[in-house]
Amino acid sequence: RQMCIRDRFITTASAQENRIKVACIGNSITYGYGLPDRTTQSYPAQLQKMLGESYQVENFGKSGTTLLNKGHRPYMQQDEYRRAIDFGGDIVVIHLGINDTDPRDWPDYRDFFVKDYIELIDSFRAANSKVRIMIARLTPIADRHPRFLSGTRDWHGEIQLAIENVARYTGVQLIDFHEPLYPYPFILTDAVHPDPEGAFIMAQTVYSAITGDYGGLKMSLLYTDNMVLQRDVPLTVQGIANAGDRVTVSTVSYTHLTLP
């Protein structure tokens, strides 16, 4: 009996050691500020439930932090950053930039944003040479935010473009927290922080990016069987499918397969 218990303990410990480690890097939105129970409702906590026991998801969010190293609270100067580096995640998900819209930060230091983001990415690559890094387009800021028209709206847009440039320069995976939340400003309880439903949407976005499971083929209702196409006019047909799925598009004269 003792041997069985010992073997079971060793097997359990081995399974824990072999789990894929996911580090969630960010500010108060990642931390779960404003949620009734951040330990179960933050997006990293909900992501853990979605991914299951073969993954270990850790929340390294720090409220008020900036991506900018000259910002009012740089993420790379926080204990959470040092713990994330020590964690050595196999997957690192970064959502930073919301607090950089502060008038203390973006107007004076915007030219450092791309450089500082690349430095952050490089530090995680140094901690784990095989790390898979995802950086996120920013969650929305609702128009009821007190600084929305005095600069925040425009700076938020500029930061989105900078994040897209970082993804291109570094070759990391770009994910989008903005598009799925934008139609629902009411779930941004204080114009910035998502409620539990919003955190679920963020977790679902990361889950799909990690696993390639997007819930099967999804296309706009604009595209239907037997639809009429205008001749001699280019038509872009787009949608979402699970990673690796091949989709067939057929017209009267042609049949095309998407690339795997």
Question: What would you call each of these model-derived segments?
Answer:
Residues 117-121, 160:
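Generic structural signal for well-ordered alpha-helices
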Residues 224-257:
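Ser/Thr-rich low-complexity repeats and stalk/linker segments
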Residues 213-227:
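Short, compositionally biased P/S/T/A/G/V-rich stretches that sit at domain boundaries
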Residues 95-101, 122-157:
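Active-site segments of SGNH/GDSL-like serine hydrolases
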Residues 18-24, 29-118, 154:
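Conserved SGNH/GDSL esterase-like catalytic core that processes O-acyl groups on lipids
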Residues 35, 138-215:
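Catalytic His-Asp segment of secreted/periplasmic serine-dependent ester chemistry enzymes
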Residues 13-15:
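Boundary at the C-terminal end of the N-terminal hydrophobic targeting segment
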Residues 1-7, 255-260:
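Conserved small/polar residues in nucleotide/adenosyl-binding loops
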